Amino acid sequence: MSVATEPAAVPQRSGQELVRATDLVKHFPITSGVILQRQVAAVHAVDGISFSIRKGETLGLVGESGSGKSTTARLLLRLLDLTSGQIELEGEDITTASGARLRNVRQKMQMIFQDPYASLDPRMTVRDIVGEPLVIWNRWKNGGATRVAELLERVGLNPDHANRFPHEFSGGQRQRIGIARALALQPKLIICDEPVSALDVSVRAQILNLLANVQREFDLTYLFISHDLSVVRQVADRLAVMYLGKIVEIGIRDELYGRPVHPYTQALIAAVPIPEPVKERQRKHIVLGGDIPSPVNPPSGCRFRTRCFKAQEICAKEEPALVDRGHGHPSACHFAEPLALIP
């Protein structure tokens, strides 16, 4: 288990937007029948979320499993088609991009996957894995082998091991290979989908430091997805909190950790362990009841109301908008109120 430590100071980022997502919706149909299929329901994986990511910053996307984080990542990469909504990259609408235009878009966006074991082809050498993007884009002949060696060295691996296979490396080393592959085409946005959750605690800090270093060196922008708020606190400039397909709170990291206003955010932060026993005993604890409702049939009004300790009648009738309610950043709660959880 990871623990909360003091985060690095939030650096100044460019005010220029790299990515803008507007009213993203992704419903997966549930069908019935074998020959004549008909839709009988839908999984509301992502249901009308909007956010932007500025150049050079790290936006943390947090929430429990099943909240829609990974689906959001795949929508941004256009690995899934939107049910509705709009995605812009550097001011260009890429919502319906296809063919050669979509290929050009995708070289600007790469992904680091959660599982360093399943995300690398066991039949390929490290040189082939890291160099595959260069081959696809016809760049291998122009110094591809040299580029692979440089990338391996940059992520802390010995270039002399480029002919080895993934099974000859540890989990942390495999994730370094995945990072090198993501850097091969010099992307502008890298989506980190739980990049350290499958690693030993002793290795996590090394990978997080590596991600921070290459971000500074190559002027990268990150969307960092995780369910572990103590990890996200170390890397994110801003946080967006998701619950059942909705963003319920979004703001600057220190604001959300210091004085969260949405009950769900408060419950998540209250669950982050503190390494100091005295502070751990003094902190406020919030226990949520029940399980996350089914995304096939989400609750009316506020989706969090079935587990919320502040829920009232209006919460079942009216869905709260994601707006600033006078607390400095947007939240989606009728009764949003700052709460200091850590003494």
Residue ranges of each PLM-predicted region?
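Conserved ABC ATPase "signature" region
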Residues: 93, 143-160, 213, 266-270
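P-loop NTP-binding/switch modules centered on Walker-like glycine-rich loops
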Residues: 188-191, 195-199, 203-281
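Conserved ABC ATPase signature
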Residues: 165-169, 173
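Helix-to-loop junction immediately C-terminal to a conserved catalytic motif
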Residues: 77
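The feature captures the beta-strand-to-loop junction immediately N-terminal to the Walker
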Residues: 62-63
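Conserved ABC transporter NBD signature motif
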Residues: 85-93, 105
